[in-house]
Amino acid sequence: MDLAALRTQQQQLAASVERADRLDRDPPALIGGADVGFEQEGEVTRAAMVLLTWPELELVEYQVARVATTMPYIPGFLSFRETPALLAAWEQLSQKPDLLFVDGHGISHPRRLGVASHFGLMIDVPTIGVAKKRLCGKIGELGDEPGALAPLMDKNEQLAWVWRSKVRCNPLFISTGHRVGMDSALMWVERCMRGYRLPEPTRWADAVASRRPSFVRWQANHG
């Protein structure tokens, strides 16, 4: 595997990421959520995609796609491993969201191309990265209280907002994916909170992917 070529490709793609707001529909009618996991000891990549209405944040559609994993796990190159399954799930949706939350990083990546940015470029849809762990950069001083906020910085460049969404929970790393500004990304994540650590779009995507009780109950109520 030619990592140098992939690194160059990342740098070229990162230059095309739009870091300012460009939503085709504002406010959005549908907000999507995406989550990727792996099955069969990594041999299969599974992507879950959900659609929620705005502003109700009610789940109206979900799709799960499974594809053969074509690339090993290599730190910093995860988007090449995850985007084939994301694209398969995206293509199964009967409608497309106006804004998509992706479980993972956007520009808060060593080469400014996490999966939220990479996939956003592929489908040319506004995306927001919602990650649970830091990949690069330094966190400013962050309080312990819910709502505490600090920038994630690298070489005098802000890569993300580090935001503690709930008491006694690790913070989220919220970043521009594509066609959404940094402050707007934070605003939309805040607006999509309903008392959990994660915003509803990625919380539901995770629930669908892992068949959590909340999703099982939803299925029972919706046939």
UniProtKB/Swiss-Prot annotation:
One BP annotation, GO: DNA repair
Q: Does the keyword Metal-binding apply?
A: yes
UniProt entry keywords in alphabetical sequence: Cytoplasm, DNA damage, DNA repair, Endonuclease, Hydrolase, Magnesium, Metal-binding, Nuclease
Tell me the domain of life.
Bacteria
- By its UniProt entry, which Gene3D superfamilies does this protein fall under? archaeoglobus fulgidus dsm 4304 superfamily (3.30.2170.10)
Recorded GO MF terms: deoxyribonuclease V activity; magnesium ion binding; RNA endonuclease activity, producing 5'-phosphomonoesters; single-stranded RNA binding
Q: Which Pfam families match?
A: Endonuclease_5
Question: Where do the annotations place Mg(2+) binding?
Answer: D35, D103
Give the EC number(s) under which this enzyme is classified.
3.1.21.7
Transcription regulation keyword on record: no
Cofactor requirement: Mg(2+)
Endpoints of the signal sequence: none
Where is the site described as Interaction with target DNA found in this chain?
A: Y73
Q: What does this protein do?
A: DNA repair enzyme involved in the repair of deaminated bases. Selectively cleaves double-stranded DNA at the second phosphodiester bond 3' to a deoxyinosine leaving behind the intact lesion on the nicked DNA.
- Protein's name in the database: Endonuclease V
Species source reads Klebsiella pneumoniae (strain 342)
Starting at the broadest rank, the lineage of the source organism is: Bacteria, Pseudomonadati, Pseudomonadota, Gammaproteobacteria, Enterobacterales
The primary gene name is nfi
